[in-house]
Amino acid sequence: MAKELIGNDWDQILNPIFTSDKYHELHNFLKKEYSTRQIYPDMYHIFTAFKLTPFNKTKVVILGQDPYHNPGQANGMSFSVMPGAQLPPSLRNIYKELYDDVGAIPVNHGYLKKWADQGVLLLNAVLTVPYGHANGHQGKGWEDVTDAAIKALSKRGKVVFILWGRFAQNKIPLIDQSKNFIIKSSHPSPFSADRGFFGSRPFSRCNTALINFGETPIDWQLPEKVSKSDLI
């Protein structure tokens, strides 16, 4: 068994990856990267999504591409930013659709931990990024980890996969659609939100699918303020 990297059932699920030669290469690459330049998130938050949402608690996956690459933003959860950080444009659009869809009042922070605590795995396909260099760690080995997570959840079944944009939708072949439910649309980025994201009602559709699976729906309303006890 590999050293516990996450601290919950994901360690066992991902053990074949964590004990592989390719992951060892990724680990060595990251050690050098973190020691020589600014990488986001900090190394203590790389596995935040997995830590907050154990395998056996995951009901929903919202798949992103890679972390935000500017200071004070990335926290290990896709689309989420640290409290106090300016809301990224994509997240502003997510909040707009959230209000239009289920009436959730937009908040002034982008800290999505409440979703993760309810079983929403906020997963980026690539878990680290160099400062100012979007997709800078693509193809270095993270995809093996996150693809394995998607496959394991798909095999277990009764998971709602929310896939925004072409990159996320390229993961559809990993998902057994007879046992899971896929919600897809254009990306919430300002460049594409008007081409199908707005009006797609992903949050209410997700909850309908969860109810059909016999699961408790997600309370999408975020707290107005983030308490210190909620910080990870």
From Swiss-Prot:
Catalytic activity reported: Hydrolyzes single-stranded DNA or mismatched double-stranded DNA and polynucleotides, releasing free uracil
Protein location: Cytoplasm
A GO biological process held by the record: base-excision repair, AP site formation via deaminated base removal
InterPro entries registered for this protein in UniProt: UDG_fam1, Ura-DNA_Glyclase_AS, Uracil-DNA_glycosylase-like, Uracil-DNA_glycosylase-like_sf
Pfam families in the record: UDG (PF03167)
GO molecular function: uracil DNA N-glycosylase activity
Membrane-spanning parts: none
Keywords: Cytoplasm, DNA damage, DNA repair, Hydrolase
Organism superkingdom: Bacteria
Function: Excises uracil residues from the DNA which can arise as a result of misincorporation of dUMP residues by DNA polymerase or due to deamination of cytosine.
Family in the record: Belongs to the uracil-DNA glycosylase (UDG) superfamily. UNG family.
UniProt-recorded name of the protein: Uracil-DNA glycosylase
The organism's taxonomic lineage, starting at the top: Bacteria, Bacillati, Bacillota, Bacilli, Lactobacillales
Gene name per UniProt: ung
